[in-house]
Amino acid sequence: MTSNGLPVPAQNSNYMENGRWYHGFRRGLYMYPCDEPEKDRMDIYHQFFAVARRGQLHQAPVPSEPHLQPRILDVGCGTGIWAIDMADKYLNAEVLGLDLVNIQPEKIPPNLRFRVPRDYESPWTLGEDSWDLIHLRMACGSVESWPELYQKIYTHLKPGTGWIEHIEIDMEPRCDDYTLPPDSMLRKWYGWLADATQRAYRPIAYEHRTRQLLQAAGFIDIQETVIRVPYNTWPNDPHQKDIGRWYNLGLTEGLEALTFAPLTRVYHWDLNAHVRPIVEGVRRELCNRKIHAYNNIHIWTARRPQQ
């Protein structure tokens, strides 16, 4: 029996924990649920990124000549929403999405396929030297070794013309006007989350050595774009306000998903006595427009050289 009195599930079946459904494939390695609220959160974040990037689906180049058939790989595709949009945009492309869990829709464009369950930290059998674009978004918290993952991506891109595009949110709270106190629940929450996921060998903290790691893997033409994302609608700038509206929705809807497993599995904290009050304290601060705090999106693009 599990801790909440349910039968122990089969190895690859979904199971209930703290009121949320988690997938059984590579059981326990991945900290985040696979239920309907989590699918909604992923799709909210897709819209959030679209707003933050002013509608831009990708930054790295994709061959658009009619006689070419670009190959696009989405690693950790989630609900598949980005892959679907790319397949719709590039009708002559071959698009493939990989994920640990089967939460993608059945009705998809004819030039799109999904391979699930697939753990992208396991060996790949996807065709080396054959992809034009490999896309990775919001992977912090599910990667044990960035050097190994970047090396896999490098070897699977076409020499000379293949690009990686990697998008992450640095979730460490930032504030330039001291309206976020040093002892805020938001800062404490992030500290606990960063520590717990580090102990689980899949840190949610943003990897600040990304440029060096991409260089070490062999990439060239490395470019970084940083977009500030406020926690709510506190900025005066209309675009920043719109970003904050979507980011607040994604964060507040996903607080339980981000918090429950790390703090109960790693720290063994009681869900109702300890973890839920933390979540509610963080939620209040995220929605407080008097707190002028933000995170940063980091968008990395890089090319595999010919030699």
From Swiss-Prot:
Mind telling me what this protein is named?
Secondary metabolism regulator LAE1
Q: Name one GO cellular component term.
A: nucleus
Per UniProt, subcellular location reads as: Nucleus
Q: Describe the protein's quaternary organization and the partners it interacts with.
A: Component of the heterotrimeric velvet complex composed of LAE1, VEL1 and VEL2; VEL1 acting as a bridging protein between LAE1 and VEL2.
Q: Which organism is it from?
A: Cochliobolus heterostrophus (strain C5 / ATCC 48332 / race O)
Q: What happens when the gene is disrupted?
A: Leads to hypersensitivity to oxidative stress, compromised reproductive development, repression of asexual sporulation, and reduction of virulence during maize infection.
Coiled coil regions in record: none
> Which gene name does the record give?
LAE1
Q: Which family does it belong to?
A: Belongs to the methyltransferase superfamily. LaeA methyltransferase family.
| Pfam families the UniProt entry points to | Methyltransf_23
EC identifiers of the protein = 2.1.1.-
